[in-house]
Amino acid sequence: SFNRPFYLDRCLQSIESFVEGDFCVKVLDDGTPETYLSKIKEKHPKIEIIKSENYQNKIAAIAENLQSGKEIDGFTIPTNLWYKAAKNASDYFMMIEDDVWFTHKINVNDLQEICKKNQISLLKLGWLGNKKDDEFVEISEITEEILRVEPKNLLLFPEFFNDLFFYNKFKFFTILYKLGIVDNSTKQKY
């Protein structure tokens, strides 16, 4: 989550209302002010909040944005935080963005059995209704409730070029963006 406490609260409320089974919730936060995180923790005491290594920098950037209007660098993505959380998770886990809300009952124990049966080690829940994104992926059915989504054009760069393009090393992606060569949807194609 990045400074979207109302989305996060709604997401957590939907989990409490619609998700059943044996599970724990870990919030990976990348810059939500402590005032909001405290309220969220008070309202949802069972969750664990893990802050990114860039948390303090993001908080400072938000404060500076509010004070002077200086733009927040949206290209600093907490990939290390996500990677560590996935690496240290149980064999089966769900990663959910804060702007995704459950609207129907699901049972994570049932999903775990489906994942075991179909050899799925990462299940990301989300809405696949954006037809614009569909042109870049192949979608196939695993079960009635679970779809497999695979990129049509998977870029396999050497690590250095991956860091440049996907992790914005040396502000490479930012430069391409400012030159008009890429936009915010470019990475979705790969």
PLM features per residue range, with description:
Residues 105-129:
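Conserved donor-nucleotide/metal-binding helix-loop-beta segment in metal-dependent transferases, i.e.
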Residues 151-190:
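Catalytic core and acceptor-binding pocket of nucleotide-sugar-dependent glycosyltransferases
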Residues 36-89:
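Active-site-proximal specificity loops/subdomain of glycosyltransferases
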Residues 13-22:
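Short, acidic, metal-binding catalytic loop of nucleotide-sugar glycosyltransferases
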Residues 1-10, 31:
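Active-site beta-to-alpha loop of glycosyltransferases that engages the nucleotide-sugar donor
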Residues 22-32, 50-54:
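Short beta-strand/loop segment that forms part of the nucleotide-sugar
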